[in-house]
Regions:
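Catalytic subdomain that performs nucleotidyl-dependent activation
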Residues: 2-92, 96, 111-112, 119-130
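AMP-forming adenylation/ATP pyrophosphatase catalytic core
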Residues: 26-28, 90-331
Length: 331
């Protein structure tokens, strides 16, 4: 009733969007408002007819408070012009709710088509198809991904995301509510929820599986070697080159370098990642495998030329990484 009108007028004065025009929800979670559709006059008449005692909060008489000013000065005068004001605002609430349902339906369809999960567990939106959509739909897809469809964003958060989706350049990122971040990559938008920083380094042992937080690292001795078995996350190396050395898998750091397989000279890890067009999210989580502090594998990209298999190799070691999120999370 009047509470709904007051709320809607306040929101309209603040420049609310379509979703804000839904006003107060009659039912939200465990909260139920059974008197929402009754006007102030109807409630006052019911109280008087049934001789119900009530307490009047004197702060409700203070017109310096915005809601009180609307209640005492705006609504009574407006009702002189339109006695059915309560019904009219009720219809606006219903229309806004129907429009929101339409948007949410479209968001579900778009998300199913355009949102994928990359090999690192990031949510990936295909940029070429995403950029042609209306900005309101794009913003709601982001809301859907981070699970904030029922929460209101503050104005600066809303405007910040809108500006980012329209104007951002490759490599730029934006912090979002609930510890999420969005990154504009070359061909995609990537979204990731920042977790607690996992341990930076892990000691590994031959013929063992090591839990490295977001992934497992495995080492096993094998009897032979085939190039066809190698993948992005699995390599076979000359195990004899690193026998009795201290093995460690850790995050890469500035200054790291190695001799990539097939090359003769050292190359900085940072340069290799740039040349490979690796996005910033992936760079932050890039690990290397070292033997006595020398990099022998830029995990997921290239082994060191030092540990390549040759005709003289006697001991074959298969090293691999299994991303936990590939098995545990789906969009």
């Amino acid at each position: 009733g009047n509470d709904q009108i007051e709320t809607l007028l306040m929101r309209m004065g603040n420049g609310t969007g379509v979703k804000g025009l839904q006003g107060i929800h009659e039912i939200r979670g465990c909260i139920v408002r059974p008197l929402l559709h009754f006007s102030r006059k109807e409630i006052a008449a019911f109280v008087k007819a049934n001789n119900i005692q009530f307490i009047n909060d004197i702060s409700n008489e203070d017109d310096s408070i915005k809601r009180n000013a609307i209640r005492h000065q705006v609504i009574p005068n407006w009702e002189q012009i339109n006695p059915n004001l309560n019904i009219a605002f009720g219809k606006m609430h219903d229309y806004s709710k129907e429009n929101d349902e339409l948007v949410r339906y479209a968001v579900k369809l778009v998300s199913k088509k355009l949102v994928q999960l990359d090999s690192y567990g990031n949510k990936k939106i295909l940029k070429e198809d995403f950029d042609v959509l209306p900005i309101l739909l794009r913003m709601n897809v982001v809301h859907e991904i981070i699970g904030e469809t029922h929460l209101s964003w503050r104005r600066f958060q809303y405007e910040g995301l809108k500006k980012f989706l329209i104007q951002s350049r490759t490599g730029q990122s934006l912090s979002l509510p609930m510890n999420w971040r969005i990154l504009r990559d070359r061909n995609n938008f990537l979204l990731r929820k920042d977790q607690e920083v996992q341990k930076l380094s892990h000691k590994v042992q031959p013929a063992d599986i090591t839990d490295c937080g977001n992934f497992y690292f495995a080492w096993e001795w094998v009897n032979d070697f085939s190039y066809s078995e190698n993948t992005q996350w699995m390599e076979t190396i000359d195990g004899g080159e690193i026998k009795n050395q201290n093995l460690e898998i850790r995050r890469w750091k500035p200054g790291d370098s190695f001799v990539p397989f097939g090359m003769k000279n050292h190359k900085k890890v940072s340069d290799y990642l740039i040349d490979s067009k690796v996005n910033n999210f992936s760079k932050e989580n890039q690990f290397v495998l070292t033997a006595d502090n020398n990099i022998i594998w830029l995990c997921g990209y290239r082994i060191s030329d030092r540990v390549k298999v040759t005709s003289k190799t006697m001991d074959f070691a298969k090293i691999s990484i299994t991303q936990k999120k590939l098995n545990e999370e789906k969009y």
